[in-house]
Amino acid sequence: RKRADVTLAVRRVPLSDATRMGILAIDETGRVTDFTEKPKQPKSDLASMGVYVFSKRALHRWLSESRPDFGGDVIPDMIKGGARVYGYRFEGYWQDVGTIQSYWEANMALLEDRPELDLYDREWLIHTRSEERAPGKIGATAQVHRSLISHGCLVEGMVVNSVLSPGVVVGVGAVVRDSIVMFDSVIRPGAIVDRAILDKEVTVGPGAIVGEGTDLGVPNRLTPSHLNTGITIVGKQAVIPRGVRIGRNVRIDPNVRATDFPSRTVEAGATVLRHEGRGRSRQ
């Protein structure tokens, strides 16, 4: 109806989050009058959701005349150039997961009795790629509390307040608590994963601990602005050796192997790096 060159999906956010988003102002007709990417001092709480609907003609023109970053270049250039840029206020579920903490919180929110995003609403189905796997199995020795267990999982240990993607295995005596574990990761018998995010195909060896200690406030020394709330992250296909103890706010690189660990203890705030030929750790 408004013959927009581009329409942005927008919604209100807490001002405390606005500094890490694209913030905009709109007039009474819904036309966008200002757009600032990650402002230090936000003038508005209206944020872009990162969803843009362009007319084909406008998209071709502005991509050829502007740099390719939509939030940083294309949208601001269109507004300055007089293009018809409008905002659509979205009132449904949406979460920005641009930080490790917000990603973890969005997953933990799914475990609430009445989550804002209802995964079981038949009127709003979630369409996503999903392999055909066997149903999830809860073994005789398992204990599961307030968790999401996907298809293909085998749980023989304890899972508390956690989200398990398809194909995750939790061995006898293992504990997964307050964590997100992605596809086909294996938690061996007796291992503990606490307040952690494990990428795909990670193996945690028998008796190993990922997320040890009560001091959540020691930030990661390489990336203190990103990893500072007690969450430990483990990269894709990393292997945590038997008995290794890993503290809080630790980053384990993808494909790390036993030879990359300088000792059996990785202190809070450290990073374990993987390099071709040999690995090294930055404590």
State each model region's role:
Residues 57-58, 64-283:
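Left-handed beta-helix
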Residues 1-56, 65-66:
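Conserved core of the sugar-phosphate nucleotidyltransferase
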